[in-house]
Amino acid sequence: MNQGFIVFLLGLVYCSPTLPESNFINPKGKTVQTRIQVPEGYTRIKSSKDSFGEYLQSFPVKKDGTKVLLYNGKTKTPEDVYVAVLAIDVGEKDLQQCADAIMRLRAEYLFSRERYEEIHFNFTNGFTADYTKYAKGNRIKFKGNTAYWIQSSQADFSYKNFKNYLELVFNYAGSASLSKELKKVKSLNDLEIGDIFIQGGSPGHAVIILDSAKSKVTDEKIFLLAQSYMPAQDIQILKNSEDNELSPWYTNKNLDTLITPEWTFKKTDLKRFAE
């Protein structure tokens, strides 16, 4: 065999790019915090019991290697922007997109804790859609751009009816309305699990912090991000395409612009749900 060709083959073996984020992936992990390992030198944030943070860290993930599917069953392209997929349905309509997925996670958390009165989201016209009113049989009607409640059904606090409520919200709320509801996080040093980078608009986008860890020697925090996108698709844990060695983790160190695979945010876009 030609010596030059052998050298070429060896070059492919030893110099080909690898996927560093695989160093942090435990294929057998069944939740966010067991699937994505923390880099050396960092300690995972321990969320308080029954908090939104604990809920997200413990959220189930689909089998390693699962592809993100769109609402119509087609595979998302590009395929190289995520490392894991959350085990939650996307529905059969093109509704659960960017901000919708975040509202879904927040609502699912509150529903699972029977904190029904805290489930409410604003429509883009400013109307507040309270889950408890919906579950008690009230329905929302529209006259022009004005929304109002009418009593039209019996009370139903079932999970199926909860999903009906969310579908209604996804139809009339989005990144623009959610951005106005959330409160601003003043400093990246204060970021928490459950915080959201969001830009309201048409289109706008939003990603949520699923997990976080802190440096053992500095105030640096690293974090995982998840998103849905357009069209509606499975919620996915994003790669960090700007830092292959740290990916899928992101860092708040010297962060001015947050570049994710499919959207760019400013540090001032960080917000959170009001408690």
Which sequence ranges carry the predicted segments?
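Bacterial Sec-dependent signal peptides at the C-terminal "C-region" and cleavage site
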Residues: 1-3, 8-23
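Generic hydrophobic, helix-prone segments enriched in Leu/Val/Ile
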Residues: 53-60, 109-110, 166-169, 225, ...
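Low-complexity, Gly/Ser/Thr/Pro-rich intrinsically disordered linker/tail segments
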Residues: 221-275
